[in-house]
């Protein structure tokens, strides 16, 4: 069975540096697993690998979308499977590197066969809700899908519409469909996660890296994006940590120092969520950030 390597970890933990070392030593090719690196024109605030780093170790699945475009976990899975096959055909080992855990989960575990959105049906559900009230729509969901109704509040119309839409299109509940997964990956997956043992070390790295981004011109990068008429804070690209806070600063919502503080706090919260995912992840080999033996540890596991 062909082998693939995953290298996960929170933001600012040293994934890219270790991945580039691996490319030099183990005939790997990198596939980025990062929901921010997919966007063009978002280089500084996403800590996109530099031109020198990309020359040493090309990354697949970066710069593949405009910031105005959407990209889902299902899109990622399809793209990643294609790239894995191309790398294996070239006689190399795919190395999947990043911190977007939903993408890793979609790739490794597969996705449920939920139906695509139906705009006409959504409009019909909204019309019914205006006539009957959202509580009555929630009562309908409780009859059709009791488990989902426990999770979804009557005041959360977006998720309520989706759950009802799935029931009406498929004749099955979202709960039933979510238990069906795609075929498992036909690969031997060797999984690693890298992070400092001390959370304070990670917090310092996050702060130092954001301040470096500011020195590299991050505010000007966001200012250029903000000039585009097709971008706004509702888009996933502009909700990336750092970008949202800088946009709000440029809108005059708060001063520069507050922006810096808010961006650093948001990045720390992201790292905390990433670590929470990783602690429950099965079959994971842990590496400590900054340890010289990490490369040899990975190579030993991959023989």
UniProtKB/Swiss-Prot annotation:
Binding site for substrate: 11-16
Stretch forming the signal peptide: none
Gene3D superfamilies named in the record: 1.10.20.140, P-loop containing nucleotide triphosphate hydrolases
Enzyme Commission number(s) of this protein: 2.5.1.75
Alphabetized Pfam families for the sequence: IPPT (PF01715)
Site (Interaction with substrate tRNA): residue numbering on this chain: 100, 122
Biological processes per GO annotation: tRNA modification
Cofactor(s) needed: Mg(2+)
Alphabetic keyword roster: ATP-binding, Magnesium, Nucleotide-binding, Transferase, tRNA processing
Residues the entry annotates as binding ATP: 9-16
KW Iron (keyword) present: no
Molecular function GO labels: ATP binding; tRNA dimethylallyltransferase activity
Interaction with substrate tRNA: region residues: 34-37, 158-162, 239-244
KW DNA repair (keyword) present: no
Catalytic reactions of this protein: adenosine(37) in tRNA + dimethylallyl diphosphate = N(6)-dimethylallyladenosine(37) in tRNA + diphosphate
Subunit structure: Monomer.
Family statement drawn from the similarity comment of this UniProt entry: Belongs to the IPP transferase family.
Cited HAMAP family: IPP_trans
Role, per record: Catalyzes the transfer of a dimethylallyl group onto the adenine at position 37 in tRNAs that read codons beginning with uridine, leading to the formation of N6-(dimethylallyl)adenosine (i(6)A).
Protein's UniProt name: tRNA dimethylallyltransferase 1
Protein species of origin: Shewanella sediminis (strain HAW-EB3)
Lineage of origin: Bacteria, Pseudomonadati, Pseudomonadota, Gammaproteobacteria, Alteromonadales
């Amino acid at each position: 069975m062909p082998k693939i390597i995953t290298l996960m970890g929170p933001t600012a933990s040293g994934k890219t540096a270790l991945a580039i070392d691996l490319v030099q030593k183990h005939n790997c090719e990198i596939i980025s697993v990062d929901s921010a690196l997919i966007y063009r024109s978002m280089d500084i605030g996403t800590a996109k690998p530099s031109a020198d780093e990309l020359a040493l170790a090309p990354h697949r699945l970066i710069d593949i979308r405009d910031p105005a475009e959407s990209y889902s976990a299902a899109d990622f899975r399809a793209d990643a499977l294609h790239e894995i096959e191309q790398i294996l055909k070239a006689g190399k080992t795919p190395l999947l590197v990043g911190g977007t855990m939903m993408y890793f989960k979609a790739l490794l575990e597969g996705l449920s066969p939920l139906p695509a959105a139906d705009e006409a049906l959504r409009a019909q559900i909204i019309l019914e809700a205006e006539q009957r009230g959202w509580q009555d729509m929630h009562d309908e969901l409780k009859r059709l899908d009791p488990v989902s109704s426990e999770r979804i509040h009557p005041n959360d119309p977006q998720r309520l519409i989706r759950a009802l839409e799935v029931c009406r299109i498929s004749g099955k509940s979202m709960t039933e469909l979510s238990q069906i997964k795609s075929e498992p990956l036909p690969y031997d997956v060797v999984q690693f996660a890298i992070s400092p043992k001390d959370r304070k070390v990670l917090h310092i790295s996050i702060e130092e890296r954001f301040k470096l981004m500011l020195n590299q011109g991050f505010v000007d990068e966001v200012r250029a994006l903000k000039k585009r008429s097709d971008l706004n804070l509702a888009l996933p690209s502009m909700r990336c940590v750092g970008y949202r806070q800088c946009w709000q600063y440029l809108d005059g919502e708060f001063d520069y120092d507050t922006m810096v503080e808010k961006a650093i706090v948001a990045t720390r919260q992201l790292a905390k969520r990433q670590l929470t995912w990783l602690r429950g992840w099965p079959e994971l080999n842990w590496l400590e950030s900054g340890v010289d033996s990490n490369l040899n540890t990975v190579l030993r596991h991959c023989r």
